[in-house]
């Protein structure tokens, strides 16, 4: 009996332990598209659309120094884009257009991340495009990813 009481006291002592407070990071904020500068919106949309339309036409116009950062220009080569386009075209068909989903502002880096839904001929697989625009109105990252379909 004595052991049970001691065990219960120890259990009570550990169960009353104070909880750690979770710190919420306010540096990344969801922003309304109207609140973003039009030049940033247009830059993200135009470069994303130009990249995806090159999959339809097989002609890619390289990004300029005033449009994208050096890292993006080095990674966006004709060879890399053509191999990615072949995979995407096989799975999804021709590129039709972009639809803006949301805009996220990273306050620490002062960047805007634009997320677009990519519309293709085949509706079997959904893809998203994310374009990151810096404070200098240059694209610092472009990425596409396949979105898992939600079960019914």
PLM region descriptions:
Residues 4-13:
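Sec-dependent N-terminal signal peptides
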Residues 8, 75, 146:
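Residues that line or immediately flank small-molecule/substrate-binding pockets and catalytic motifs
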């Amino acid at each position: 009996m004595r052991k049970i009481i001691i065990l219960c006291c120890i259990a009570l002592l550990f169960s009353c332990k104070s909880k750690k407070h979770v710190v919420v990071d306010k540096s990344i904020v969801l922003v309304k598209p109207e609140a973003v500068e039009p030049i940033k919106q247009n830059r993200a949309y135009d470069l994303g659309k130009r990249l995806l339309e090159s999959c339809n036409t097989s002609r890619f116009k390289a990004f300029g120094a005033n449009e994208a950062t050096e890292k993006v220009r080095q990674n966006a080569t004709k060879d890399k884009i053509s191999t990615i386009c072949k995979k995407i075209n096989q799975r999804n068909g021709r590129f039709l257009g972009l639809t803006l989903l949301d805009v996220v502002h990273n306050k620490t880096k002062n960047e805007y991340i634009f997320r677009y839904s990519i519309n293709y001929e085949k509706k079997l697989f959904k893809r998203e495009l994310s374009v990151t625009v810096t404070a200098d109105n240059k694209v610092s990252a472009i990425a596409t990813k396949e979105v898992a379909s939600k079960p019914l």
